[in-house]
Amino acid sequence: MSVLSALTVCSVSAQSEKFNYDTVIATWQPRQLSIASIDEAEKILTSSRYLQAKGDERERIVRFTNIMRQKFDSLNAGQKERLVVLEARLLQGIHKFEQAKQHLNQIARFRSPAAQLLLADINVQQGNAKKAKENCEKLVGQTSFLIAFTCMVNADFSQNKDVKFLKKLSAFETYTSTVRPAERQWFYEVLADMSLQLGNAEAALEHLSQTEFEKLPISAMLVWADAHFALNNYKAVSSGFSNSVPDILTADDGLLLKWAIAERAQGIVRSEVQTQLAKNMEIRVWREDSSHAAQVATYFLEIEPNYPLALKFAEINWQYAQSLDDKNLLERARQANEVSTNA
């Protein structure tokens, strides 16, 4: 899950069609307004993590960063660093983790809390908990204590699912009353994720309820869905998303995937959601999309069984992301493919 927003205001049944690299997953009405500042660009990128995202945020920010690059020498030191971090966040968003880290080397001598948080997040996704914790430790004295401590405990837990880390983090709940809403929301999201992974879905839902549902980032909504799945409450997921998602055409694929899983568990085999998801997956398969490889693998494991394809994308995902979740996905795909091959 991304932590950076805590400091700044992841066989097809659809009808086949020809694709090229201009084929889009989502569509939107063109926007005429350009981004005016780095501050605005940061806010827009953060907004892309929420239900109200229009789907064009990334494209708009890429245009903005390209323009700013032409003016790079005229920017002051602070502006240069913020631009580099913004560009690195774009790279992280498409799982180009090594490129993102190399990009951040441009500001190695002066790294803001935002840069350290981004590096910590990338290292967690790559399965390097030790390095992630080192990044988190550099936040001490540079940002709120709650953010620094949550970052460190989250790094530890990413490679060692021990209840002691949950207890350690829970002890600092008292500090949530003095931090900004975004920091508070992230703290509870981390607590929820830990609780769920330790088998306490009820506690996970309780932590997530500290934030109004529609104001949760999509990453937290995915945890919310998994918590309900653990309780066999699939109707809550399909109903919750049906009441909250403004447009499935621009909805996040991860969210659509959870929604489709909930529908299938209720015996719903055809729906607008599943049709849209199938179209999105077909395009991602054609592109061999590495940034959504985990979602593609899960789709072909749980929605439209195609185990060789699931394994292919689990292996693609593993080339970039090596958290415990990614390892488990790869093992699931290997086992499913082996069973189907030997059947």
Kindly give the residue locations of the regions a language model identified:
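Residue-level recognition of tetratricopeptide repeat
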Residues: R49, R89, D121, N154, ...
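Primarily a tetratricopeptide repeat
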Residues: R63, Q102, E134, K167, ...
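Structural motif corresponding to the intra-repeat A-B loop/turn of tetratricopeptide repeats
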Residues: K54-G55, I94, Q126, Q159-N160, ...
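Start-of-helix register in tetratricopeptide repeats
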Residues: E42, R82, A114, I147-F149, ...
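Solenoid-like repeat scaffolds
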Residues: Q29-A36, R69-A77, L104-R111, C136-F145, ...
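TPR-repeat structural position
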Residues: E57-R58, F97, A129, D162-F165, ...
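Canonical tetratricopeptide repeat
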Residues: L86, L118, C151-M152, V190, ...
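N-terminal leader/linker segments that initiate helical-solenoid repeat arrays
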Residues: C10-L83, H95, Q102, E338-V339
